[in-house]
Amino acid sequence: MTRNDPIKHFFIWPALLIVLIISIFPLVYSLTTSFMSMRLVPPTPARFVGFGNYIELLSNPRFWHVAGTTTLIAFLSVGLQYVIGLSVALALNARVPGEGLFRFVFLLPMLVAPVAVALIARQVLNPTMGPLNEFMTFLGFPNLPFLTQTSWALGSIIVVEVWQWTPFVILMLLAGLQTLPEDVYEAAALENASAWQQFRDITFPMLLPVSVAVVFIRLIESYKIIDTVFVMTGGGPGISTETLTLFAYQEGFKKFNLGYTSALSFLFLIVITVIGMVYLAILRPYLEKHK
């Protein structure tokens, strides 16, 4: 079969159609549903309401609260992941003793399922019977409300997210560091540039494209967080740690309000798109400068 042989279409189009059906149909169906009033329990006939679901959602204080909570968790956790990940990647790239062991240990958290990590964290941070509070009580400190007080619960979720996903950042940044040309550093050493000057003027600017990509990927993933929150706090206390995806789960799988949930999903998509566009727009001048 040659490159221009028409028979190739018999192999390409079926696969392409399957992909389109699997990906496009649910998207179109969900968009259509977002303009309908549709409930499964109690079962009610679908009724066109236009932008009614979107208006109701945007006027719901709970939506803005969970959007703010999701943003807080995403930005704080990703920021910490990047700072810690860059520090560890720089250390590993410097060929420290026991580098292979360190790489293995640092990558372990990423290999564990988020639900399993959240279950372990919930047991460890249990405010009454958790090992951490038991140890603190043994040392004479009072029990801390790790999962029962808003600020502590948010902090606990962020710490767990940082612990699990910093290895991904380390892996990506370390790969980027190992592609940087050695001759640039040799020239800087001849100019008696300090380690800080080399990092500021060489390493960080040259690593910027990788950094932008890594932070962008982690931001998108952090906005989709549900498993860690669902298992550790269930969105509580109250709704203080509820995220956008958990809110959608509550509306879709507990209240069976499909139209409202579909509208929420598309607003979530818009939020992610806007954040991504703003993020890339802010960093584009720096990327062009250091290209």
Model-predicted segments: where are they?
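A structural signal for multi-pass alpha-helical bundles of membrane permease subunits
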Residues: N4-K291
